[in-house]
Amino acid sequence: EGYLERLIRAGFKVAICEQTEDPAAARKRGGKALVARDVVRLVTPGTLTEDSLLKARAHNHLAALARAGGNLGLAWLDMSTGDFTVALPGLGELPTLLVQVDPGELLVPEPLVEEPYLAEYGSLLTPLVASSFASTAGERRLCETYGVASLEAFGSFSRAEIGAAGAVIDYVLLTQKGRLPRLARPRCQEAQAVMAIDGATRRNLEVLEASGGGRRGSLLGVVDRTATGAGGRLLAARLAAPLTDIAGIGRRLDMVQALVEASGLRGKLVGALASCPDIERPLGRLSLERGGPRDLAAIRDGLECAIALRHLLHEDVGGLTPLPEDLVAAATALGEHNVLIGRLG
């Protein structure tokens, strides 16, 4: 993995070859026959799953830009966690959206490679033939992936968004040799749902990085007291794209206020979360048949933590004002996993 990290950081794509045949079978073909080997994976900057190649508290996005019917569609996937989002930015909004997404790799149709708004992403661009972004093929691929007859259940997507999302799925299938990680349903980010912060403003405000580079001294570095990698990634994503919806902001503030007032419960939750491993990324590796015993143990320990969190949120906390609906929903969604934990134990 040391060599792999160096090559990826330098912008290379790496083909992983493995032995695909038993030596005894090779000998049957002749005394000097070579054991069969094949490429089992292409490692690219946007398709990383190894913890050693990823930042624990930052997403690593594989993004795709498509054009259809005069519109631009952008889709981005964190292959290590399965988070999948699409958006329909105007040409003037695209640079700001790309800064928000901060892709590790950006798939683009060959005709768009020379567009001025992509100039600063030169080293991150992976040009593909225009047919890779066809919306009809993209819709078919998405329906096959999620096992649905149509995409209507997921929301209303433009042809450009579908083309971009389909290109992402196809590229993952190509690099993973026909395998797909665990994927969330594609979520549409509405243009006015989050605040647009352009690159210059983001740098001047030092939202995610300080002027000298790194988190230390940035807004994120100051406010990040999360106990888990997943929590750190969520906080960074929310700071990168602050809500503009008053109702949504109010719901978040209700949850903050409830936990500020319930200091005892808050302390117990922090203690429980501190022992909770990151299970999103182990799940992603296992779904690609790339995980190991350590990943299974992380999922077991994470599920035990989920049960503890669920019980804490349902405890009688001594006269506390009823928890906000979003916290109750989160507690319910944690579920019970005793049988699975037993099997993993």
Protein language model features and the residues they cover:
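Aromatic-lined, polymer-binding surfaces characteristic
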Residues: 270
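Charged, amphipathic alpha-helical segments characteristic of ABC-type P-loop ATPases involved
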Residues: 273-345
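Basic, polar low-complexity surface loops/patches
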Residues: 1-261, 278-284, 288
